[in-house]
Amino acid sequence: MPKKKPTPIQLNPAPDGSAVNGTSSAETNLEALQKKLEELELDEQQRKRLEAFLTQKQKVGELKDDDFEKISELGAGNGGVVFKVSHKPSGLVMARKLIHLEIKPAIRNQIIRELQVLHECNSPYIVGFYGAFYSDGEISICMEHMDGGSLDQVLKKAGRIPEQILGKVSIAVIKGLTYLREKHKIMHRDVKPSNILVNSRGEIKLCDFGVSGQLIDSMANSFVGTRSYMSPERLQGTHYSVQSDIWSMGLSLVEMAVGRYPIPPPDAKELELMFGCQVEGDAAETPPRPRTPGRPLSSYGMDSRPPMAIFELLDYIVNEPPPKLPSAVFSLEFQDFVNKCLIKNPAERADLKQLMVHAFIKRSDAEEVDFAGWLCSTIGLNQPSTPTHAAGV
């Protein structure tokens, strides 16, 4: 794909000269920020939206608990609850994640310090960050509000997400992961549908990435539920890298394409129920497992087999063949893209650069897809959105 010429970024200091959430010398910070942003390959629309967000952010100042008014709950997970809030001094609508942690003040201060790196994460593919602070036993992380919610919520309403839409999602996730790796030397560590946020302007952004090692350690006990997206090498406790994020992306894409978490794989009967036609050659070859006595009969999606215990699931990811897309329903390019993400050996798995030039990504990039229109009609949103009163279009 031809490289876009960087467009100059125009950022104006806040009228009162106030710093960005408690940092000093706003003018110097803005100059450094302007330089970094000009290195990004932004189109005109992305540039204007990022400018609008950063200009508004300058007016926010230091964040305090008393300055927020709760509007509604957006979701819960990863040891925290996320609320849609109004920041009264600026009038901005934000998403505020509250994480309750019983920790010593020194650890708490280290987490807040480590989270400050998020101020430097400015990309069209990363959720905007307003600031973090501690109050009454809880760490607050204040972010841009994305009115379409997360892709796991969208999936519940859509049933399945079309391949063309997932093409645009794949591009955004690859670009977001590439930005984090190249500009900040960090990996995400928790790629899954609930950490991919969307809005009615058609933007797709990553959130909840592992910028604070201390926060990850402090929340280690709450990460059990996310292990189902972890790569085999990570589950085995060996060294892992951004290749692990690529596995998680591949698994997430299969889940969103078929409409349920893909382990264990759907059998022929379930595939027929899912797609309304006989899908040959992709049925699960695993025989039905006997149900462990006393275990509840809940299930993933339409799967009539007994649910897996967490240890069975992790064992399956490590020792059984990886999931794949049913061949009769999806394009060869999409199938191959997912297969390259889900190679069990991380050294053989495709890397970000290889994926960016894959035929599926090239095709998806060239396709005209009204992502915003699809999202709004699927979840019942008005279009276009103004997630904050300052959103530039």
Curated annotation (Swiss-Prot):
Record GO terms (molecular function): ATP binding; MAP kinase kinase activity; protein serine kinase activity; protein serine/threonine kinase activity; protein tyrosine kinase activity
Entry text on domains: The proline-rich region localized between residues 270 and 307 is important for the binding to RAF1 and activation of MAP2K1/MEK1.
EC numbers on record: 2.7.12.2
Location of the region described as RAF1-binding in the Swiss-Prot/TrEMBL record: 270-307
Function description: Dual specificity protein kinase which acts as an essential component of the MAP kinase signal transduction pathway. Binding of extracellular ligands such as growth factors, cytokines and hormones to their cell-surface receptors activates RAS and this initiates RAF1 activation. RAF1 then further activates the dual-specificity protein kinases MAP2K1/MEK1 and MAP2K2/MEK2.
Annotated disulfide bonds: none
Posttranslational modification: Phosphorylation at Ser-218 and Ser-222 by MAP kinase kinase kinases (RAF or MEKK1) positively regulates the kinase activity. Also phosphorylated at Thr-292 by MAPK1/ERK2 and at Ser-298 by PAK. MAPK1/ERK2 phosphorylation of Thr-292 occurs in response to cellular adhesion and leads to inhibition of Ser-298 phosphorylation by PAK. Autophosphorylated at Ser-218 and Ser-222, autophosphosphorylation is promoted by NEK10 following UV irradiation.
Gene Ontology CC terms: centrosome; early endosome; focal adhesion; late endosome; membrane; mitochondrion; nucleus
Annotated spans, Disordered: 1-27
Domain Protein kinase: 68-361
Regulation acting on activity, per entry: Ras proteins such as HRAS mediate the activation of RAF proteins such as RAF1 or BRAF which in turn activate extracellular signal-regulated kinases (ERK) through MAPK (mitogen-activated protein kinases) and ERK kinases MAP2K1/MEK1 and MAP2K2/MEK2. Activation occurs through phosphorylation of Ser-218 and Ser-222. MAP2K1/MEK1 binds KSR1 or KSR2 releasing the inhibitory intramolecular interaction between KSR1 or KSR2 protein kinase and N-terminal domains. This allows KSR1 or KSR2 dimerization with BRAF leading to BRAF activation and phosphorylation of MAP2K1.
Native source organism of the sequence: Oryctolagus cuniculus (Rabbit)
Principal subcellular localization: cytoplasm
Entry binding sites for ATP: 74-82, 97
One Pfam short name: Pkinase
Site annotation Cleavage: residues: 8-9
Name of the molecule in the record: Dual specificity mitogen-activated protein kinase kinase 1
